[in-house]
């Protein structure tokens, strides 16, 4: 028999395996050792935020997505935009019934667009099962009525980045543990032209990640456990009174107009002493050590530490930002979109991206707590927990 020909039995066996792969997605692909037969020329469009760790977007474009294209036999186009523009893009796409197949979200945004997305529990549960389960926060924001309306992707930790030498000069050899202590040291530093620089503008990340824990630490809340609006309370009023004075005493008052990049630039330029942020400030100082210097000419990276938000009268709180991906209902390639998210979420494919983040993002599952990366740099350890 001609070695280049196959008989009917061989053809049925191979074609059957390929069909099973198409039905079973990534797991089927691995089992059949060939990609599913998606229509020739299929293109998948994906929108994500422009990452604060540029190396991660580069990795996606140049390495991970090209590998996914080969595995899935499809073209994948990635668009990265300012996270503040994502929600308007989602709204326009749903109203026009056309747009990206996959869109990244933050917080609980997907609940606003639930009627316009596909249920993705088949993908999410496979990732969770293989990696120790999702964090409660990641699962909660991605589900509605017990169903996954988005696939959890990551969690960006928020800590206060601060100039350890500047605080030490004012007697704070450890970061303040209460709002009163933070206000006192901040007031001294502002008098020297080194204010706290807190983002408080209408923006997606740092401002809400500061404001909510601050409010909670005073006993305030937007809603109670039954969903009743309870913002108008004595505790909320007390938090506002303190913050008004704290802002004038210790902050760069221009922060009311800052977005999530203004405080990064202010810190790295030596204009502020502290700010709530992801680890992107420190990571950028590592990336360009000779560009970012202290007033003494030393590399900025040597003078940065991270701390949790101070505690208030009702305790200490934190909010870390969960990221997810939605598969859009108007999309014509929903199965392929799910296969891509499963491919990206599997441990062997997610790990290179996780490493490129250098601790800026952690995985949505408990698996990544055990990763050796946390032994690489003690300055990043606060983001592990």
Task: List the predicted regions and their residue ranges.
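Short, solvent-exposed loop/beta-turn-alpha elements that line the ligand-binding surface or hinge
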Residues: 121-134, 202, 218-240, 287-302, ...
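Extracytoplasmic "Venus flytrap"
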Residues: 43-61, 81, 156, 205
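Glycine-centered hinge/linker elements that transmit conformational signals in sensory
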Residues: 185-189, 227-257, 305, 309
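Extracytoplasmic/periplasmic solute-binding protein
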Residues: 145-153, 158, 183-229, 235, ...
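Hinge/lid segment of periplasmic solute-binding proteins
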Residues: 106-159, 183, 210, 299-308, ...
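N-terminal secretory signal peptides and thylakoid transit peptides that target proteins
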Residues: 2-19
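Extracytoplasmic "Venus flytrap"/periplasmic binding protein-like
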Residues: 66-134, 143, 165-177, 264-266, ...
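C-terminal lobe and pocket-closing loops
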Residues: 108, 280-300, 313-385
């Amino acid at each position: 028999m001609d070695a280049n020909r196959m008989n009917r039995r061989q053809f049925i066996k191979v074609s059957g395996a390929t069909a099973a792969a198409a039905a079973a997605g990534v797991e089927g692909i691995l089992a059949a050792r060939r990609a599913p037969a998606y229509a020739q020329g299929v293109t998948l469009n994906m929108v994500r935020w422009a990452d604060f760790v540029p190396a991660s977007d580069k990795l996606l474009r140049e390495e991970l997505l090209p590998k996914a294209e080969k595995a899935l036999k499809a073209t994948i186009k990635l668009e990265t935009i300012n996270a503040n523009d994502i929600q308007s893009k989602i709204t326009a796409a749903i109203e026009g019934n056309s747009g990206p197949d996959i869109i990244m979200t933050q917080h609980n945004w997907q609940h606003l667009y639930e009627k316009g997305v596909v249920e993705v529990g088949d993908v999410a549960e496979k990732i969770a099962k293989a990696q120790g389960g999702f964090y409660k926060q990641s699962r909660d924001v991605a589900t509605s009525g017990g169903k996954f309306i988005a696939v959890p992707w990551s969690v960006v930790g928020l800590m206060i980045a601060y100039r350890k030498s500047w605080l030490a000069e004012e007697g704070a050899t450890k970061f303040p543990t209460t709002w009163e202590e933070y206000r006192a040291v901040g007031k001294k530093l502002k008098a020297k032209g080194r204010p706290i620089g807190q983002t408080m503008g209408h923006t997606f990340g740092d401002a809400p990640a500061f404001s909510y824990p601050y409010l909670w630490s005073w006993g305030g809340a937007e809603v109670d456990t039954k969903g009743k609006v309870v913002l108008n309370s004595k505790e909320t009023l007390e938090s506002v009174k303190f913050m008004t004075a704290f802002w004038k005493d210790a902050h760069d008052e221009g922060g009311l107009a800052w977005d999530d990049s203004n405080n990064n630039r202010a810190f790295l330029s030596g204009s502020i002493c502290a700010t709530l942020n992801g680890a992107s400030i420190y990571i950028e100082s590592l990336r360009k050590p000779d560009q970012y210097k202290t007033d003494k000419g030393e590399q900025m990276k040597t003078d940065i530490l991270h701390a949790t938000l101070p505690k208030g009268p009702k305790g200490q709180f934190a909010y870390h930002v969960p990221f997810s991906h939605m598969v859009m209902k108007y999309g014509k390639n929903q199965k392929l979109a799910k296969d891509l998210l499963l491919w990206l979420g599997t441990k062997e494919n997610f790990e290179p991206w996780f490493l490129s983040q250098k601790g800026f993002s952690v995985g949505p599952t408990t698996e990544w707590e055990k990763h050796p990366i946390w032994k690489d740099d003690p300055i990043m350890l606060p983001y592990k927990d």
